[in-house]
Amino acid sequence: MARKAYQPKRRSNSNQNQQRSDSLKKNKQDNLRSKSAGNQQGNEKNKKDIQDQRNKASTKKKRESSGEKYESARDKVIRRFRPGDNALKQLRQYNQTPSLLIRKLPFQRLIREISTRMTEEDSLRWTSFALVLLQTVVEDYMVSFFEDANACALHAKRVTLMSKDLALAARIRGQKNVTGIFIPTKK
């Protein structure tokens, strides 16, 4: 006897439609149940969140009073400086450092250019110590000159430094030819 292949029984279309509608109803009921349970859980979560926020605030106050560091970057207060405060901070920083303010190589090139213009020789030789010494003297002179010019601007009830302040400071010092750059040429 030959075996027949297994074939499942076919259901009628009306039977399938009824099962689909039953499963949809069950899904809707399950969704409604889970939402109502979720709301209860959501309320509990909200309560926990509020308690966590209160705990964080209390620990933050404790940390601030005890002088501990901040917990995270969000806890830090962003400080905004008033206009001019950063400039004054930089001035104090530059006053404390003994290093030179002008870069060495551009200053050396300027000195070599001026020395070739003033002398008939094509190039004078400079030692590195002489260039550094000259640079320190020039920077010291410039700082004191600008301090005097700033005092003239403040006397005129201005904060902005103008060329007339520089000219007045030079005139008080007894210098001449300050209005323009005076570089002698070869004779």
Curated annotation (Swiss-Prot):
SMART domains: H3
Pfam family, one: Histone
Comp. bias regions, Polar residues: 34-43
Keywords: Centromere, Chromosome, DNA-binding, Nucleosome core, Nucleus
Summary of the function given for this chain in its UniProt record: Histone H3-like nucleosomal protein that is specifically found in centromeric nucleosomes. Replaces conventional H3 in the nucleosome core of centromeric chromatin that serves as an assembly site for the inner kinetochore. Required for recruitment and assembly of kinetochore proteins, mitotic progression and chromosome segregation. May serve as an epigenetic mark that propagates centromere identity through replication and cell division.
Family, similarity comment: Belongs to the histone H3 family.
Name of the protein in question: Histone H3-like centromeric protein CNA1
Phylogenetic placement of the source organism: Eukaryota, Sar, Alveolata, Ciliophora, Intramacronucleata
